[in-house]
Regions:
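C-terminal catalytic/substrate-binding lobe primarily of soluble NAD(P)-dependent oxidoreductases
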Residues: 1-137
Length: 138
């Protein structure tokens, strides 16, 4: 209907925009939730994950600077593949130290980092995996 490619089921698609209108998009989401009690987007299951991929060769001991930084970018991948490979989510790729050197373009895994996992973001990730991943946290 909209001229976008979908998966084989026809239910899922992704749209790329080379810009982000947060000032407009955020207001629409807030007003929709407040006035209509409706979300502008609500996942029904854990289908996909955005994982950290190296922008350049990184050395052991380097600290990742997260989204918008100089060390990693986010790559969308199926949740099952992300969980089974223990890929590092892009949202958790800030202020973590590499325990091994990683070549440009490689997905960073949990085995590649040393991170303080007591922060709330890490705890929320663990709860999400326990709730939405068959068999719980991987």
């Amino acid at each position: 209907q909209y001229g976008m490619d979908t998966d084989d089921s026809g239910r899922y698609s992704a749209m790329f925009k080379p810009f982000h209108l947060i000032g407009l998009e955020l207001n629409i989401s807030i007003l929709s939730a407040a006035l209509r009690q409706q979300p502008t987007g609500a996942p029904v299951c854990f289908n996909a994950d955005v994982v950290a991929v190296t922008k350049r060769d990184l050395n052991e001991g380097e600290t990742l600077d997260g989204e918008g930084g100089y060390t990693v970018w986010g790559k969308l991948m199926p949740a099952a593949a992300s969980v089974s490979s223990q890929a590092l989510p892009i949202g958790l790729a800030s202020n973590v130290t590499l325990t091994t050197a990683i070549k440009q373009g490689q997905i960073i895994t949990m085995k590649d980092i040393n991170a303080e996992t007591s922060a709330q973001a890490w705890q929320v990730r663990d709860k999400m995996l326990a709730q939405f991943t068959p068999g719980g946290k991987s």
